C-alpha cells in the first residue's frame, strides 16, 4: 500500500472508531459513507519538497478538491482552477543533479526548475504523454506517446527517438521463391526494375543516416505480435519492448446485467474474463538497439526453475500432458504489481532490472539484462508452492548502480541491497517493510513498518548500511 492510500485508510478507520460508541441505525449504515468522513485519497510533494499537495472528496459531492499544505504543517489551502497551470503533479522524475524535475499534468509533459521555480511546458497535444525522464547527460527530456518515444531539447525541438511498429518491415527482402528466381532470370525488365528499386532504397537509407536533421526510421517487430509496453534507456541506446502473441485467445469477457438504469431497460456491463476460464497471455521481451533498429528476443533460460513445473503432480493426476520447455511468463504490469514499476534503469542507462512472474504464480524473479547476449540473469528468485504475493515487490537502483529490492523470502517483507547471495538485509524481524522511498543521495530509505503490532503502521527510516532504524 502506498503512503497516501495508507494514511487515507487510517483517517477513515479513526473516524469509524470515534463513532463506534454511538448506536448506528440501519438507515445510517446503508447511507452514503460521507457521514464517516472523507479521507485523503492521494498525496504528493512539490518538486522542491517545500509543500504537500493532496486530493480529498468534498462532503456531499462527487467532486475531488486539491489542497496544498506547507511542509511544516499549518492550514491547508484549496487550489482553485485558475492556479492549476502552476501545479506540480505526482510521479516526478529528477535529473542527476536534482535541479530539475519533469512530470505529467493532464496528459502533457512539464519541467520545473528547482533553482528559480520556472515551469516549462514541453508538450501540448491531443494525445497523452507518459513516462517522462531526463536523458543520462541531462540534455534532453525523454517521454512516451503511445508506443513511440520522443526527446525534447531546450531549443524546443521534439524529435522521435524510437517508433515501434507491430508490422512486417516493408524494406525487408522476402525469401526468393523458385518461381521468382526463374522469372528474374528470364525477364531482363523485371530484373532491372528490382535492381533499380533496391538501389533507390539503399540511397534513401544512406542519405537518412548521413542527415542529422532526419528522423530515425521505424523499428519493426513483425506482424505476429501486439505491443504491451516499452521502456527506453536514459542514454537512448537501448529499448525493451513487451509483446503478446497476436490473435491469442484472451477468453470471453463476462456480461454483467444491470436492472436499475436511467433508461428503464436492462443494460449489460462488460467485465473481466471469468476466473479459471483463460490464463493470462504469455509475454515476451525484446531488446532493441535504437541506432540500428536491430531486434533480439530476450532469453529467459538462465532463470532458476524456469523449466521446472510446480504443477507436475497435478497434471499427472489429471492425466494431462507434462509441461514442455519453459513455463509461460509475464513481465508484470503496474496494475498487477500494486503500483510498483516492473522495469527499472540505472541512472546512466547501462543496467536494466526486470521483474518476471510465472503465470502459475509460483515464482517471481528479479533479473538484470546481459545486453551482449540478450539474456536475463537472475538476481533474486522468490518461490512459493502456494502463491507469490502481488505486493512487496518494489526494486530499483541507487546512485552508483547499487541494486535494492523488497522480498518476502524470510516470511516477512524486508529491504535488501545488493545482488544475489551478496545481498544484505537492511531490515529483519517479525514485521513488514513496504512503500520504500529513498532520498536523492541513496543514503536513507523511508518506508512503512509495523514493528509494534500488525495493524500499527509507522513511517520508519534506515541508513543504506542497515544502521539507524
Predicted regions and their residues:
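Bacterial N-terminal signal peptides that target proteins for export
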Residues: 1-8
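Beta-propeller folds
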Residues: 8-12, 20-469
Amino acid at each position: 500500500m502506498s503512503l497516501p492510500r495508507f494514511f487515507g485508510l487510517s483517517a477513515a478507520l479513526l473516524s469509524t472508531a470515534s463513532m463506534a460508541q454511538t448506536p448506528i441505525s440501519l438507515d445510517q449504515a446503508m447511507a452514503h459513507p460521507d457521514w464517516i468522513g472523507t479521507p485523503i485519497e492521494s498525496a504528493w510533494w512539490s518538486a522542491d519538497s517545500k509543500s504537500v499537495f493532496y486530493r480529498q472528496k468534498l462532503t456531499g459531492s462527487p467532486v475531488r478538491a486539491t489542497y496544498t499544505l506547507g511542509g511544516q504543517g499549518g492550514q491547508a489551502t484549496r487550489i482553485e482552477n485558475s492556479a492549476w497551470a502552476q501545479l506540480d503533479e505526482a510521479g516526478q522524475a529528477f535529473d542527476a543533479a536534482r535541479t530539475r524535475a519533469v512530470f505529467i499534468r493532464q496528459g502533457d509533459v512539464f519541467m520545473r526548475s528547482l533553482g528559480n521555480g520556472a515551469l516549462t511546458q514541453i508538450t501540448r497535444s491531443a494525445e497523452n504523454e507518459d513516462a517522462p525522464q531526463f536523458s543520462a547527460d541531462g540534455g534532453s527530456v525523454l517521454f512516451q506517446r503511445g508506443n513511440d518515444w520522443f526527446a525534447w531539447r531546450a531549443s524546443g525541438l521534439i524529435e522521435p527517438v524510437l517508433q515501434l511498429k507491430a508490422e512486417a518491415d516493408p524494406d525487408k527482402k522476402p525469401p526468393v521463391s523458385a518461381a521468382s528466381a526463374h522469372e528474374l532470370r528470364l525477364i531482363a525488365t523485371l530484373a532491372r526494375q528490382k535492381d533499380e528499386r533496391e538501389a533507390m532504397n539503399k540511397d534513401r537509407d544512406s542519405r537518412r543516416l548521413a542527415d542529422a536533421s532526419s528522423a530515425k526510421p521505424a523499428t519493426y517487430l513483425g506482424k505476429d505480435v501486439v505491443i504491451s509496453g516499452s521502456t527506453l534507456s536514459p542514454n537512448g541506446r537501448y529499448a525493451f519492448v513487451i509483446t503478446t502473441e497476436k490473435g491469442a485467445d484472451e477468453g470471453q469477457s463476462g456480461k454483467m446485467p444491470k436492472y436499475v438504469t436511467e433508461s428503464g431497460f436492462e443494460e449489460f456491463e462488460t467485465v473481466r474474463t471469468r476466473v479459471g476460464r483463460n490464463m493470462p497471455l504469455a509475454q515476451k521481451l525484446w531488446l532493441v538497439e535504437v541506432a540500428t533498429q536491430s531486434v533480439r528476443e530476450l532469453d529467459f533460460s538462465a532463470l532458476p526453475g524456469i523449466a521446472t513445473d510446480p504443477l507436475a503432480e497435478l497434471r499427472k493426476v489429471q492425466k494431462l500432458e507434462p509441461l514442455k520447455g519453459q513455463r509461460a511468463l509475464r513481465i508484470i504490469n503496474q496494475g498487477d504489481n500494486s503500483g510498483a514499476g516492473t522495469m527499472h534503469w540505472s541512472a546512466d542507462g547501462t543496467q536494466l532490472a526486470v521483474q518476471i512472474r510465472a503465470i502459475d504464480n509460483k515464482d517471481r524473479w528479479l533479473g538484470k539484462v546481459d545486453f551482449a547476449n540478450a539474456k536475463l540473469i537472475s538476481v533474486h528468485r522468490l518461490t512459493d508452492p502456494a502463491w507469490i504475493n502481488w505486493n512487496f515487490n518494489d526494486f530499483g537502483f541507487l546512485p552508483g548502480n547499487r541494486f535494492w529490492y523488497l522480498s518476502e523470502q524470510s516470511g516477512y517483507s524486508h529491504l535488501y541491497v545488493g545482488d544475489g547471495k551478496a545481498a544484505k538485509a537492511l531490515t529483519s524481524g517479525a514485521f513488514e517493510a513496504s512503500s520504500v522511498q529513498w532520498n536523492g543521495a541513496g543514503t536513507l530509505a523511508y518506508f512503512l513498518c509495523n514493528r509494534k503490532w500488525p495493524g500499527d503502521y509507522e513511517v520508519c527510516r534506515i541508513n543504506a548500511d542497515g544502521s539507524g532504524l
